[in-house]
Structure formats: structure tokens, C-alpha cells
A protein has these predicted regions:
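Short, small-residue-biased leader/transition segments that mark boundaries at the very start
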Residues: 1-2
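N-terminal targeting signals for Sec/Tat export/insertion, comprising classic cleavable signal peptides
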Residues: 7-30
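Signal for well-folded cores of large energy- and translation-related assemblies
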Residues: 8, 12, 49-52, 186-190
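A structural detector for beta-sheet-dominated domains
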Residues: 10, 71, 125, 169-171
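Signal peptide-directed extracytoplasmic domains
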Residues: 19-21, 30-161
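A generic structural motif
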Residues: 28-31, 74, 169-174
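Phosphate-binding glycine-rich loops and their immediate beta-loop-alpha structural context
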Residues: 137-192
């Protein structure tokens, strides 16, 4: 019998939400206003200093950077080295993330540990265009996705074979489906499984 995930979920097997703070660069003037958003300026300074560039005391004027929150779902049984999608959302006053690249961003679980690292070019579904007399915004240009944009660095241990019992939670609970699944499990238990 193959497990049909459209019928039931195995209790305890689930995705885990991850979150991180990062910078998107290459925004062609649509990023954060550094005078209004101090955390973007501080993050940019800290990142450049880690790379050996000292800009303390210098006046930074760039609209090409935005502070962002990065979120993703670590899949159940996600293994180290595999990739997952992430969503990138502007945190400051950036107008548009189109054309931006997310710099290396650690993604943390609720326990504070790093489980994945994200980086890459954003795909934006929204857009913004403006002229002298009008401005048009469609969708949400301050939110984007990076398909396969994070690499899983740490796995969440879940030893299904060490559980004393495995519980199934039916997606659409009804007596007939429950009875059929119970019969299939009991039949499997009687057979020699290799």
C-alpha cells in the first residue's frame, strides 16, 4: 500500500516556517530612503564592514537598497543541500523590488537556529509606473519570490520508525474512508514487508 497524502496526513509530519532579515540590492532608485529608514542604512554599513569596506561617518545616498523580511516553509523531511522557495517582502519605504537581488540571508526557525540560507534574483508579480501626471500600481511590487532561492542547511529530526504509534489524520473525515484505511493498514500488518 502506498500512502496517499490526499487522504490523510501523518500526525507530527508538517512544514516549519522560517524567517530572516536581509537586504535587496540593485533596485534602480526604488529602494528605501536611507534617511527615513535607519535600519537599512545600519544593515548596509554592517554588511560592507564585514567585507572590509569602512563607510562609518560617510554620507550614504543610495535608493538601490531595501531592507526585507524573507520567509519560507521548510518542507517535512527536507534534507540538507536541497532547495526551497522563499518570499521576500519590503520592510521599509521601498516602492518596488523589481530587478533586485537578495543578498545572503540566514533563515531561522522558531527556536532561533538557522535552517536555511537564501539568496538570488527576485521575481515580482506586481508593477508600478509613474509619469508627471499619473501613477499606476498593479499587484504588490514590494513582495517577490525566489524559486528554489534557499538551500537547506539543517534538517529537522523526525524518526517516524521510532514512534510507538503512527496516527493518521483524515483530510475529509468520513467513516467509509477511515474503515478502508484501517483495513489496508491491518492487511499490511499481516503481510511480510521488505
Amino acid at each position: 500500500m502506498l500512502f496517499r497524502s490526499d487522504l490523510a496526513n501523518i500526525e507530527g509530519v508538517r512544514q516549519n516556517q522560517l524567517i530572516g532579515y536581509g537586504l535587496v540590492v540593485g533596485l534602480n532608485g526604488t529602494g528605501d530612503t536611507l534617511n527615513n529608514i535607519p535600519f537599512t542604512k545600519q544593515s548596509l554599513q554592517a554588511m560592507l564592514e564585514r567585507m572590509g569596506v569602512n563607510i562609518r561617518g560617510a554620507t550614504i545616498r543610495t535608493g538601490n537598497v531595501a531592507a526585507v523580511m524573507v520567509t519560507g516553509n521548510l518542507p517535512a523531511f527536507g534534507t540538507q543541500g536541497t532547495r526551497m522557495d522563499v518570499t521576500v517582502s519590503a520592510l521599509g519605504d521601498a516602492k518596488n523590488l523589481q530587478g533586485g537581488t537578495l543578498l545572503v540571508t540566514p533563515l531561522l526557525g522558531a527556536d532561533g537556529n538557522v535552517y536555511a540560507v537564501a539568496q538570488g534574483s527576485l521575481a515580482i508579480s506586481g508593477f508600478q509606473a509613474e509619469g508627471e501626471a499619473a501613477k499606476i500600481v498593479r499587484g504588490v511590487p514590494t513582495v517577490g519570490r525566489i524559486a528554489n532561492g534557499a538551500i537547506i542547511e539543517r534538517e529537522i529530526e523526525f524518526a517516524l520508525n521510532r514512534l510507538p504509534n503512527v496516527r493518521l489524520a483524515l483530510r475529509n473525515a468520513d467513516f467509509t474512508t477511515a474503515k478502508r484505511i484501517a483495513a489496508a493498514v491491518n492487511d499490511l500488518d499481516r503481510k511480510s514487508v521488505v
